[in-house]
Amino acid sequence: MGQDQSSVFDLAAVAAASNGGNNDPLLPPARFIGDPQKPSRMPYNKYASYSEQIPFDYPERTWPGKRLQRAPRWCSVDLRDGNQALVNPMDSERKLRFWNLLVSMGFKEIEVGFPSASETDFDFIRMLIERELIPDDVTIVVLTQCREHLIRRTYEALKGAKRAIVHFYNSVSVLQREVVFRKNKEEIKKLATDAAELCKDLENEAKGIDLYYEYSPESFTGTEPEYAVEVCNAVIGVIKPTPEHPMIINLPATVEMTTPNVFADEVEYVSTHLDDRDSVVLSLHPHNDEGMGVAATELAVLAGADRVEGCLLGNGERTGNVDLVTLGLNWLTQGIDPQLDLSNVPEIRKTVEYCNQIKISERHPYAGNFVFTAFSGSHQDAIKKGLEARQVAAERAGADLDSFVWLVPYLPIDPKDIGRTYEAIIRVNSQSGKGGMAYLLKTNHNLDLPKRLQIEFDKIVQNYADTTKKEVKDGDIWRLFKDEYLPVEQSGMTAAGVVVGDTHDASLEPWGRLKLLKVAVSSGEDGSDTVLKARLLDRGVNVGDDEPVEREASGIGNGPIAAFLNAISNFGVEASIMDYVEHTMSVGTDAMAASYVECQIGEADDAQIVWGVGIDSSITTSALKAIISAINRSQRQR
């Protein structure tokens, strides 16, 4: 082995012996409340810091002062880099389905395989070419190591293609040079330049193909940036790209080893030290070993990268390649066109999960089941108010709501823009507040509860959640609401009127002493008072046991509500209104109205404060039903 440096293990050992492998200037002592954290028994002394492994500093950096302004060129590597990481690699049917998805999303560069290493990949590439499945505006990418027989086989796979990128690579990192290849820097560089020369020589065998080249110094993050530039410039010198016919220099974070800011420094260094920079597309190939792949990519684009390779929803070796869906939608939330069709993320997820045979996390950015879900009460309340405020602002501006600026607390993106719905935004559990319950009733049943009624009903919902120890779904909330406020008939439907989302529910017991059968309202003789006559069904306090009796009552007051309160006093019920709110539930000739009344039932020490709810096509009748609801609740035997 040619030796051009001390053993990588010697360097690491020295680093680990000093300051736990980190000789960077120490930060000020941490501030804390209470007792300090205790030293762990974790073997941190066996690890060397990245700065000890790859000494590098770049004070000339300019990327921190820049902002994202446009989407990079995207390249999907799902069909090769992603596929090789699967327990069960894709068969031809799954590969073709994935290919069709990528094309439909607007990818213009798609890595289709490693034809010299896999007969399956070779056959798939031949199928795409021979069946003319490659659109004219899509360029396929084929991968090969810097080995002669593999490169020759790669060109065989491309016969008949219109345009292709030949991507050749070799590992150049300190660790790989010493441990895997046992070659010095010059020998490693020669592997790359020999491969580049062979690719150029084989162009005569690829006549008719518009050929481009991509070179990757694999394990770039484990390589001295100065040496990476040296190798890349040597390859550029062989390929001789032009601005009209550029080549790609791809920087793989084959293993994520450091923080995104350091990676960005390295990328900017390479970008500013490459030869013929105007003839080079600088590309990234980030992995996610330390969970920072997306952040590292975005900072590296600021640092000069033009192109990004990754996989849909983050598939790939170990912890995966960077997620192109997350990146694209991050750009979208900044008002930048991602230049990919991400309007149906559920369908993208469905296809990716089918082809990869791997389920994604419930909390995967943008695509997971819970990403637009709020269980927290304060979050729910803020989302509800944010959606309402946005609608009001759009109406005031005379703007289309779908295109109006999106500013809603806790929701960085409009779920509708990516094929999601609002239905699952609010979820209720024992930790939720009244906002979630109120949102679901308003969204799914058109009931906009007053604040104090929300507080009252929330106690009922929370008691149910605490008892069941489960999520409280919309159906549970609606059943609880009916059972508490809307007298239920033998049919299991409410007696309050037609309600959005109401269904038969045999689990509910009929309740409600009084039921309004008919009401007539007229003016008194002098026109100053309202005369009301009502027919009610009195089912007794023990509904189902007592014999129902129809009763009539009449009353006079300065309006229908006052007259009705006067009428029911004939039943021995003294009631007064403390608060009254009503709203329409829909528009049109069959529109319904909802009324909410806060009543004092009884007098003096026996008085109860009770809310009632009524629904009817008549606003007046809905108010009277709400009063009956309050009375029924005050007399209900549980």
Curated annotation (Swiss-Prot):
One example GO MF annotation: acetyl-CoA C-acetyltransferase activity
GO cellular component annotations of the record: cytoplasm
Domain Pyruvate carboxyltransferase: 72-346
Keywords on record: Amino-acid biosynthesis, Branched-chain amino acid biosynthesis, Cytoplasm, Leucine biosynthesis, Magnesium, Metal-binding, Transferase
Gene3D superfamilies the record matches: 3.30.160.270, Aldolase class I (3.20.20.70)
Compartment list: Cytoplasm
UniProt-annotated stretches for the region Regulatory domain: 488-638
Function: Catalyzes the condensation of the acetyl group of acetyl-CoA with 3-methyl-2-oxobutanoate (2-ketoisovalerate) to form 3-carboxy-3-hydroxy-4-methylpentanoate (2-isopropylmalate).
Family classification: Belongs to the alpha-IPM synthase/homocitrate synthase family. LeuA type 2 subfamily.
Name of the protein: 2-isopropylmalate synthase
Gene responsible for this protein: leuA
